[in-house]
């Protein structure tokens, strides 16, 4: 594994959701410069992109020690991905399991494209670390969220760009309860509340009702996972101290 230190800058893939917001805080605690990157690929829950600036501003306002570290935000139009994807993430169709055993919310190649574009931006910006919220513990079976995929992608990107970029995935082995716990460790209850209220997870883009665990329809897989994780976090179930 390539070693990094606090002087290295980081580029965080930031969708506006719980996981990526936690990753932004994780990076701000570690690196002197942290930039963020979002993608508009025609997702049904595009409202998450509208949450991004609110999260960034709240982080700067509530955590002054991080304010000077939070740098530029980048937004990339990847509508072509939505155009070639016939999935419940980009179409108004019912969420179900496909014939291959994967949920039809899986967007083929999404994280591969995200990381490749992120690496190109990081290369241009002089940032050595990419941070993503991929997770192999509480996940929907997406193959591009697996640890093996990220490790292979790091090798391919460094070979293809003749550089030394590191892909960090701090949530890879955490369940959703531990992700809430990590937020508490990083920024106390203030960060937990910020993530609860300001971020968005719901696949169908519902943001009319604020539940105990945040906004959402409460019925889609993303909402159910977030709800279960938050309830387990409050009860202390399966929550040991999350590794920082």
Curated annotation (Swiss-Prot):
Cofactor binding comment, as recorded: Binds 1 zinc ion per subunit.
One Gene Ontology term of the molecular function aspect: ligase activity, forming carbon-nitrogen bonds
Residues annotated to bind Zn(2+): 202, 217, 220, 223
Reaction(s) this enzyme catalyzes, per UniProt: 7-carboxy-7-deazaguanine + NH4(+) + ATP = 7-cyano-7-deazaguanine + ADP + phosphate + H2O + H(+)
Enzyme class: ligase
Pathway where it operates: Purine metabolism; 7-cyano-7-deazaguanine biosynthesis
EC number(s) stated in the UniProt entry for this protein: 6.3.4.20
UniProt-recorded name of the protein: 7-cyano-7-deazaguanine synthase
Protein source organism: Burkholderia multivorans (strain ATCC 17616 / 249)
